[in-house]
Amino acid sequence: MKQIVKEYLIEIKDLLKNKKYLYTIIFISILSLGFAITHYSIGVDDLCLNRYVSDTYILSQKRWGTWLLYNMLNINEFSPFWLDFLTATGLVILAVIVSAFIKKETKEKSVLPYIIFSGVFISSPIINNFFMYQSTNLAIVISNIIIIICGILIYNNYFKCKRKWLYILIGIGMTIPIAMY
């Protein structure tokens, strides 16, 4: 399993070293998410984020994963620019992780398919919808990253390692992102 993780880290590093890929997804991210980051909308839930996190109202909604994340990062008041900026950064990281998985499995040398995939993924309106209406958008992106990593581990365990205990460990790890929604 350590070798598999090393291979994925090499693929991620290879993508990030490619200037065409990196500059293109940064440019697409700015075009797709820049307006949402700098022109945020404020909802009722946003204004009482400190009540949700500090007063543990979010725990009554069974969202202990979000409560845990926001307390670990010490996010207990609404600061839309930084939350949205971290969320956009997480979305780019998610696109890079999935592109590295596709690159490793398809062994495609050209960077164009990964640019297209990452660009469509980052700019997709369905992905970007939670920017406008969710105060827990950072938790959603972090949970998506965890779910994708768990999916990659399940895939590699099924086809390469075949360790049954790893399924149990991944299943336990999946409870955190599920509790963030």
Identify the residue ranges that each predicted region occupies.
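Alpha-helical transmembrane segments
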Residues: 19-34, 113-120, 171-172
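Short hydrophobic/aromatic helix or loop-helix immediately within or flanking a transmembrane segment
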Residues: 56-81, 85, 89
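Extracytoplasmic catalytic/substrate-binding loops of multi-pass membrane glycan-assembly enzymes
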Residues: 31-51, 57-69
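Juxtamembrane "helix-exit" motif on the non-cytosolic side of transmembrane helices
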Residues: 37-43, 73, 102, 123-133
